[in-house]
């Protein structure tokens, strides 16, 4: 890890964690990141553990976890709750698979509509517009 990640101001901390200051404040409001003590007449300081925590949140977001799910994963981060964490990941994996199925269905419908648009001849209404207006449902559109 980078050297000297202790005693950081919020700006330096945000940069080290790869986010902006508003993201830090947002995570604090959401309870994902504790707000450090503010010594009298001083400014709050952050350390390596805070940087690691923000990176954890960002990594989990990239995998599709919601902030509520990330809060739950953080709660489980003592090394003894692997089964609970695995269960959360299994649910997320199922969600991802369902979304992929939906996206594949949408791709098929859109592909058919684009083909129909390119294949139309004469003064026929646009198949895409007609489909969206409900005049003619493309195959599989009711599932989208």
Swiss-Prot record:
Q: Which PROSITE patterns match?
A: HTH_MERR_1, HTH_MERR_2
Sorted keywords for this record are:
Activator, DNA-binding, Mercuric resistance, Mercury, Metal-binding, Plasmid, Repressor, Transcription, Transcription regulation
Q: Would I find Transcription regulation among this entry's keywords?
A: yes
A Gene Ontology biological process in which this protein takes part is: response to mercury ion
The yes or no answer to whether the keyword Membrane is present is no
Q: Which InterPro entries does the record cross-reference, listed alphabetically?
A: DNA-bd_dom_put_sf, MerR, MerR-type_HTH_dom, MerR_fam, Tscrpt_reg_MerR_DNA-bd
The record's Pfam families line, in alphabetical order, gives: MerR (PF00376), MerR-DNA-bind (PF09278)
Question: Which residues take part in binding Hg(2+)?
Answer: 82, 117, 126
Record GO terms (molecular function): DNA binding; DNA-binding transcription factor activity; mercury ion binding
Name the DNA-binding segment ranges.
Answer: 10-29
Q: Which parts of the sequence belong to the HTH merR-type domain? A: 7-76
By its UniProt entry, which PANTHER family does this protein fall under? MERR-FAMILY TRANSCRIPTIONAL REGULATOR, REDOX-CYCLING DRUG-SENSING TRANSCRIPTIONAL ACTIVATOR SOXR
Q: What does this protein do?
A: Mediates the mercuric-dependent induction of mercury resistance operon. In the absence of mercury MerR represses transcription by binding tightly to the mer operator region; when mercury is present the dimeric complex binds a single ion and becomes a potent transcriptional activator, while remaining bound to the mer site.
The name this protein carries in UniProt is Mercuric resistance operon regulatory protein
Q: Which organism is it from?
A: Serratia marcescens
Q: What is the lineage of its organism?
A: Bacteria, Pseudomonadati, Pseudomonadota, Gammaproteobacteria, Enterobacterales
Gene that this polypeptide is encoded by: merR
């Amino acid at each position: 890890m980078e050297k000297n990640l202790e005693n950081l101001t919020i700006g330096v901390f945000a940069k080290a964690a790869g986010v902006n200051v508003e993201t830090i404040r947002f995570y604090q409001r959401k309870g994902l990141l504790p707000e450090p003590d503010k010594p009298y007449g001083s400014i709050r300081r952050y350390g390596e553990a805070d940087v690691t925590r923000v990176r954890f949140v960002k990594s989990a977001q990239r995998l599709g976890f919601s902030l509520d799910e990330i809060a739950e994963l953080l709660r489980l981060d003592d090394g003894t709750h692997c089964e609970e964490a695995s269960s959360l990941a299994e649910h997320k994996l199922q969600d991802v698979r369902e979304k992929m199925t939906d996206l594949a269905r949408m791709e098929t419908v859109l592909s058919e509509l684009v083909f129909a648009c390119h294949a139309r001849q004469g003064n026929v209404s646009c198949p895409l517009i007609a489909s969206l207006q409900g005049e003619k449902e493309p195959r599989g559109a009711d599932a989208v």
